[in-house]
A protein has these predicted regions:
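Short acidic/histidine-centered micro-motifs embedded in hydrophobic/aromatic stretches
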Residues: 96-100, 115
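Active-site-proximal catalytic alpha-helix in oxidoreductases
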Residues: 64-72, 104-106
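Mid-chain, well-packed structural core segment of small domains
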Residues: 69-94
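Short, structured motif recognition centered on aromatic/hydrophobic residues
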Residues: 59-67, 96-97
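Substrate/cofactor-recognition hotspot
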Residues: 99, 104-110
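Glycine-rich phosphate-binding loop at the start of an alpha helix
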Residues: 56, 60, 77
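Acidic, glycine/proline-rich low-complexity segments that act as flexible tails and inter-domain linkers
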Residues: 1-56, 85, 109-127
């Protein structure tokens, strides 16, 4: 295994997801197939999410937008944490979610805003 890629994967995962309570999908994947989980993590986190063409903040806001339209609550939850962890503001995350009304409709926006509120509560940032 490429040690540099392994370290980059760990560093990126920690930067993005260190505030998640209850673990990440990776923990569940390992219970199913440890080797496949490692390969998936190294590809997604070590290679794709570590690219520097766009900033981590831009990448996470894209993820929040896409996952909102797809109505993937658990993933929105993880990536809202990640977006905030890499410098996105509450206003930026909210704006990205609201913008998705054009593409996914109001129900997915309402659901993602509910998830966003939960994340802020978990972080002690809901007021």
């Amino acid at each position: 295994m490429d040690e540099a890629l392994k370290e980059k994967t760990k560093k990126t995962a920690k930067m993005l997801f260190h505030t998640l309570k209850g673990g990440t999908g990776f923990e569940d994947w390992k219970k199913i197939d440890k080797e496949l989980a490692r390969e998936l993590s190294m590809f997604f986190t070590g290679k794709l999410y570590s690219r520097e063409v766009i900033s981590q903040k831009q990448r996470e806001l894209c993820a929040v937008a896409s996952l909102t339209v797809l109505n993937r609550e658990r993933e929105v939850h993880a990536h809202v944490h990640a977006a905030l962890n890499v410098g996105a503001t509450r206003q930026e995350v909210a704006e990205v979610i609201f913008q998705q009304v054009t593409y996914g409709g109001m129900p997915v926006v309402v659901e993602s805003l509910r998830v966003f509120k939960e994340v802020l509560e978990e972080r002690g940032e809901w007021q």
